[in-house]
Regions:
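Residues lining hydrophobic/aromatic ligand-binding pockets adjacent to catalytic sites
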Residues: 1-262
Length: 262
């Protein structure tokens, strides 16, 4: 493994003000500040609405050259159209993301829990030929029927990563289907957004278990992506730091930056 990227799912959280961000930091400066602390972020907002070119170009310009992103495909593709005839939406998303492609580690298809392999596998087979070769891809499934050898073969044949997801509703098997890993610490929706600035749950045992799985496959992958959601333990940056510590990476420091208002 050449590189382990550890960061958060999203960065635009007002609840982080005074905890991660300086209390008076302008929201327009959030990403620039975040990228001075972590070297990776998952773009969560693209799931709700595809970003526009202005936003993408700005994200590229305010982050360091070695900063990296992942981005979710819009829910229009996965949840509303349920993978049916996505070519038009794919083309738009790829065109929008292209100015950032040199910083994009992977694009993520997050499927809804109601989408079974029986309904979706045939659509997925047709869809893989529409994917732009400029990007790498990962897929997160939330129905047990997808954990099947035929699905794994399709993903492996196309170097599409089966994302490992720590959810309270389903357990993803640690299958390797690509030359990289994508691990997402998601949790549930029991933590209120106003409490996102502090840790609410002890998840260390789970973090350790998943770190062992990453370590098990380190010689088989080029890189690994670790994304920590606020809903997982209450404070994404702290979860990311805990994982870094477990795997032997130096913890990132934001307190000194925050006090200086950098």
């Amino acid at each position: 493994m050449q590189k382990l990227y550890v960061g958060c799912s999203g960065w635009s959280y007002d609840a982080w003000l005074g905890h991660f961000y300086p209390a008076n930091l302008d929201r327009r400066e959030f990403l620039k500040y975040y990228s001075q602390v972590f070297d990776f972020v998952e773009i969560d907002s693209s799931f709700y609405n595809a970003p526009n070119l202005f936003m993408i170009k700005r994200w590229a310009s305010v982050t360091p050259d070695d900063f990296r992103f992942t981005a979710k495909f819009p829910r229009l593709i996965t949840h509303e159209k349920r993978l049916s005839d996505p070519e038009k939406e794919f083309r738009y998303f790829f065109d929008v993301m292209r100015p950032l492609h040199h910083k994009v580690l992977a694009l993520l298809l997050q499927l809804p829990p109601s989408l079974t392999a029986k309904e979706g596998l045939k659509k997925l087979r047709a869809m893989v030929h529409m994917l732009d070769s400029d990007f790498r891809y990962a897929i997160e499934v939330r129905h047990q029927s997808w954990f099947d050898k035929d699905v794994y073969k399709l993903l492996s044949d196309n170097n599409i990563c089966l994302a490992w997801s720590q959810l309270d509703t389903i357990q993803t098997p640690p299958e390797l289907t690509s030359d990289f890993l994508y691990l997402r610490f998601i949790g549930d929706r029991s933590i209120d957004e106003k409490d996102f600035g502090k840790v609410q749950k002890d998840r260390l045992k789970e973090l350790k278990r998943w770190s062992d799985e990453v370590n098990r496959l380190k010689d088989d992958i080029k890189f690994a992506i670790i994304a920590a959601n606020n809903h997982y333990a209450g404070f994404g940056p702290a979860t990311a730091n805990s994982f870094r510590k477990i795997v032997g990476l130096k913890e990132v420091q934001w307190e000194e930056m925050k006090q200086k208002g950098l």
